[in-house]
Regions:
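Long, low-complexity, Lys/Arg-enriched
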Residues: 1-112, 125-179
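Conserved SAM-binding loop
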Residues: 116
Length: 179
C-alpha cells in the first residue's frame, strides 16, 4: 500500500464526482485518510444538495468501512461564502482558498490527490495554478472521465458508486510542479 494521502475535490451540483474519484483511488490501493471538498456558497440549492449527499457517504468519519474524514472548504470573500465567480474579486478569493488549502496540507506533509472535475471551471483552473506552485512530484492531479450514459444515470447523485465495468476512470493530468 502507498503512503497515506488526501483527496481534494472541487464540488458543484454533481456529488458523485467526489465518490467516483474516491472509489477509483481506493481501487488503486491508495490510502485516503481525508477528503476536502471545495465549494461555493450553499445558498445555491444544487451545491447544498450535492454537499448533503456527499456528507451522507461519510457518516461517523467512515467511508466504505474505512476511516476517512470529510472536510468542507467553502470559498469565502470578505468572510462571507462566495455565491459565484463572476468577477476578479471572486477569482482572487477562489485562488486564495486553493493556495491556502494546498499550502497548509503540504506544510503538514500530506500527499495530495486533486480531482478538479466538479464545480465551476474557474475553480479547476485556479486549483491547477495553486498546484503548480505548491505541489511536488508525489502529488497527483486527476480528471474524472465518466461515460455519457453513466453521467446521465448518475446526474445529481442518483448513483454515488459504479462498478469498474461502467467505464469511469481517473485520468492523470500531467503537470510539472514548480514547488
Amino acid at each position: 500500500m502507498t503512503k497515506a494521502s488526501v483527496l481534494i475535490a472541487t464540488l458543484g451540483g454533481q456529488p458523485q464526482v467526489v465518490t467516483f474519484a474516491l472509489d477509483a483511488l481506493l481501487a488503486q490501493n491508495e490510502e485516503i485518510t481525508a477528503v476536502y471538498v471545495i465549494h461555493l456558497s450553499l445558498d445555491n440549492l444544487r451545491t447544498r444538495q450535492a454537499l448533503t449527499r456527499v456528507q451522507q457517504e461519510f457518516a461517523g468519519d467512515q467511508y466504505a468501512g474505512r476511516r476517512c474524514r470529510l472536510r468542507r472548504v467553502p470559498i469565502l470573500l470578505a468572510g462571507a461564502p462566495l455565491a459565484d465567480i463572476h468577477d476578479e474579486a471572486g477569482a482572487e478569493a477562489t485562488g486564495q482558498t486553493m493556495r491556502t488549502l494546498l499550502g497548509d496540507l503540504k506544510r503538514d506533509g500530506e500527499r495530495l490527490h486533486l480531482c478538479l472535475s466538479g464545480g465551476r471551471r474557474m475553480m479547476a483552473l485556479l486549483a491547477l495554478s495553486a498546484a503548480a506552485l505548491l505541489c511536488d512530484h508525489q502529488d497527483r492531479i486527476w480528471h474524472l472521465y465518466t461515460p455519457d450514459a453513466v453521467r446521465q444515470q448518475a446526474a445529481g447523485g442518483a448513483l454515488m458508486h459504479v462498478a469498474p465495468a461502467a467505464g469511469v476512470q481517473l485520468i492523470q493530468t500531467p503537470i510539472v510542479p514548480w514547488g
